[in-house]
């Protein structure tokens, strides 16, 4: 640090005062040089009060605060010095030091360079610049900085030696050799240069010259222990073990208890195959005082080979701490760190290994693998290519490069890499597993299953492949050996958690398996810690957070972070909320993690949020978090969790004082950096709060919300064409919906209004009834024209000037209406015949993805169908390859194939609308229908559910509780079956419940987005008031209910 107090400014004070000032300045400088920073600061402050514009005093204060790690104060005084003298190079250099310590290397480099422009002969500036450039990875720039320093003072032999070390690390051995020789020429007795020159000769294979220079170094400095060690090493390389032992024994004669020499002697024993003797000697070295990395590396290798990984790690750590120039130690230790999930440490070790040995293919590949985990995909790709350049048959590098390309959405490139890896090594299990992952993500589940099974044949103990295979089999409902598979999967997770490894079961999948709550939470915790590891490499200081609302005009700033602002179920649920916040009390920021998909969903959120920021254009998590923090966010909301597209690293950096999970992820984050999870009493009962790492923050009704009333207002009303059976008018055989439905009905003759009684609400279907009006179109020529349109597959017809469209043709008429981006403008006809559903049967449905079905669920459904003879189950081909498995298991349970009817997945609007055709939805207890539950309820179809132990298994019960339909919530499997059977056999009861759901979806809070937003605001204010009072996050389980008029 530049700390001069010379050039004291002119003064009109008496000479006596000047001498006093100068004397005090010299005293402060002596105290600074002696390391008595407290006294130096005290005297400097006296000087500063006398002459606040004295740049010498300002520089010394800057240096003192820097040494005391008070970087902000150091920068402050440097800045004051610059204001007094904008040409003061030392002040810019001091600022550069502050930036370098903060990890802001580019800013540091720019300040050093500015200092050098002001003072070209500023040698300390060049040295500082070189150090910053090395830290930034600009080795060539660092070399030039050292060269410039030496141009001004060629006799700086230490700097020249440092330059030699840098050149040696770059592999420019001849230039390094020249530096060391010049240093020796300047100072012939500089033993370090002799030893370093010996290292260069050793690297060049000049063994005897290396031996000579090490011996010269020892001659110049008989206490130069490292030179003895290097001499022993080079003799060991030459396999001259006797002389190597002699060199180490000579070192021991100088320092009998020196661990370095013991370690290197043990290394020779190891090379001779005397493993036990080597380990004993290594242990003796460690018992003394560890100083030599080779000994630790070799001991670690031996210990790891014997299964003593923890001890091996200790030895590698010591080697790294003392000498970061042992490539194998660095690489091997990095491997252990990566296995443990300590990503930052692994990266540092790999980089060090490559500094020492740039042509180290394995280190390139290993580093690339970790960089990929950190999201640094381009840099990872570069290292994989280097590994392959160095070793063209490096199958691991090809396979891992495929992983990177896959993450970069280059599916074809990834396929080529995996295929090449398998060509090089057909028995490469990891490559087969990686190839399977490509097939899995592409929806090609059968191919994925085949490749995972190949991987497991080649490598039976392969947890990742086994757990991914289990998930694939779950997706297609292949339940062969299901119980045994679940048992083994749980065992794998238990073993991985016990060994502190990243579990092979993803947090988002953990709900599907019979894991304990502790295991599920621990899986999430491991992934949360992985996020912390990824951001630790940024070395960012913690953010300072506001305690009041003064800087935001009294408004609470809420930031919603999501990769799903677009055509995604999450946006379908919450797209209206940003625009419904009270602008007088809330300022809404939406941070998109994905590019614009061009849909109206994206446009709506962009238009209605106060601020919309596309963070997908800021791939660096540190810079993205800076942006959030600069916006002064008070509450930052995580809408992704561990779903696709998440960037939890942003939250790990804590850019906001309060951070909450909400809506998009059905479980705990397990992360220390998430304060709250927004939930409700039914979904997350207080008695299971220990399942969550976050504090519970309750909404008064349900934490779930749907924007269905805004997206699908045409489904608020319906009319039916008269379909009589046993004297009943059915409301779900031929259904008409449309914004202009009333006007259309008014244009028709003979439309009947049938009054249907339904309960007023509550948990009893027999409570007081309200009449609902059901418009019924009689079977006349108009009805016949509509039916003929459906039967003939026509897209659209016109009746009385109104466009009547086939419900299967929405995409052809208006694609944005089909996706839910716009409200359809036609009258849409939906019929059971369109989907092959029987007209006279009870239709049970479930529109979830098939992975949510397990054997016990299908058995329960089969029992229901058996008890309701005239009934069918309507499922989706989601995916299609699951259909034959479901049919086969159902037949094994005694159900003929025609009792289960499959339909293709449909566009969003049709998906919601066709739910009207079912009589009852049977929920999946393993993992409920969340968005699909809202869809079917908006269609007016009752849903029977049975809450389980996980958040994901209790959402439907929360929705039904909010809807006021507690009679549809079962306590156990038998009750689930009984409720469903009663609905299927007691048609009057079914009509009442259907009427109740139809009415309650409008009158209850479930789809009331405005009221929900107000309740959410109240919860946000609770969080903020709790924080502003100086409290740590705590459970908020006494929600305040508000009404829309509040």
Curated annotation (Swiss-Prot):
What does the UniProt entry say about where the protein is found? Nucleus; Cytoplasm
Which UniProt keywords are listed?
Acetylation, Biological rhythms, Chromatin regulator, Cytoplasm, Glycoprotein, Glycosyltransferase, Lipid-binding, Nucleus, Phosphoprotein, Repeat, TPR repeat, Transferase, Ubl conjugation
- Pfam families found in the cross-reference section: Glyco_transf_41, TPR_1, TPR_11, TPR_12, TPR_8
According to its UniProt record, which reaction does this protein catalyse?
L-seryl-[protein] + UDP-N-acetyl-alpha-D-glucosamine = 3-O-(N-acetyl-beta-D-glucosaminyl)-L-seryl-[protein] + UDP + H(+); L-threonyl-[protein] + UDP-N-acetyl-alpha-D-glucosamine = 3-O-(N-acetyl-beta-D-glucosaminyl)-L-threonyl-[protein] + UDP + H(+)
Query: Which residues, renumbered to this chain, carry the PTM Phosphothreonine?
Result: 454
Give a GO molecular function annotation for the protein: protein O-acetylglucosaminyltransferase activity
Protein name, UniProt field: UDP-N-acetylglucosamine--peptide N-acetylglucosaminyltransferase 110 kDa subunit
Q: Which organism is it from?
A: Sus scrofa (Pig)
